[in-house]
């Protein structure tokens, strides 16, 4: 199953970015694919959840994510991340600052999906 795919949650279409337990190289490769997909959608229309459970973050991964979140910003209606205390606050803050986006963090995919469609 493709880790980047649209799913339906409570009748709404949500883009799932499933980075669960991915290596740094996998996260970098997958995050580089995201903007091309999202920018094909109408502006302000995409609900997106990124699940980073079990990912070991480093500065390289953060740089890839910063770029992707900045490029796709106009197309995002709402976004949420799933993190399990694996992203240091300073790195999370640098992504938020660079992308000029507020990205709420949840401890489970279900909670993140519920937030997106609420």
Regions found by a protein language model. Give the residues of each.
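Amphipathic, Lys/Arg-enriched alpha-helical "gate/interface" segment within cytosolic domains
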Residues: 1-118
């Amino acid at each position: 199953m493709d880790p980047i795919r649209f799913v339906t949650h409570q009748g709404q279409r949500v883009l799932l970015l499933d980075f669960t337990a991915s290596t740094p190289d996998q996260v970098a490769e997958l995050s580089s694919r995201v903007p091309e997909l999202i920018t094909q959608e109408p502006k302000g229309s995409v609900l997106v959840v990124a699940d980073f459970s079990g990912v070991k973050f480093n500065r390289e991964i953060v740089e890839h994510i910063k770029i992707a979140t900045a490029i796709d910003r106009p197309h995002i209606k709402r976004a949420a991340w799933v993190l399990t205390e694996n992203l240091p606050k300073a790195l999370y803050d640098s992504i938020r600052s660079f992308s000029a986006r507020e990205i709420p963090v949840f401890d489970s995919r279900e909670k993140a999906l519920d937030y997106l469609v609420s």
